[in-house]
């Protein structure tokens, strides 16, 4: 039986064969809408909701929402119970230290939470008022 030698594979081919892992960074914001004291309260979020870096003005876009309807639909908020929903945004710049959560809408009543301090996990809990 003939000896089989190990084939040489050029480095460019090896690189192409390696799995491509691209780290996707996202910012998760858990929002609390305080308990209303009456029935019939409605809530929704617009796609024009951003995280805005307080220094650079960079805008991170809303990419996902949980437990809240997206405009033009509404979500009913139960009375006497805090209502929680989650928003997921594209990443913030590395050097961002604080940011605002702002819903930019063509009417009154858009959400705004100012000066949220950046943390290492990029997971936040805020109160919407």
What are these regions (language model features)?
Residues 24, 78-80, 119-121:
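Solvent-exposed, conformationally flexible loop/turn segments
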Residues 110-129:
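Acidic/polar low-complexity flexible segments
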Residues 36, 41-74, 78, 128:
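The feature marks short-to-medium sequence segments in extracytoplasmic or secretory-pathway proteins
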Residues 25-36:
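Short, well-ordered beta-strand segments enriched in hydrophobic/aromatic residues
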Residues 49-55, 103-110:
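Short edge-strand/loop segments of extracellular domains
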Residues 1-24, 55-68:
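Low-complexity, acidic Ser/Thr/Pro/Gly-rich terminal tails and inter-domain linkers that flank the onset
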Residues 64-106:
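Short, solvent-exposed, Trp/other aromatic-anchored flexible loops in extracytoplasmic proteins
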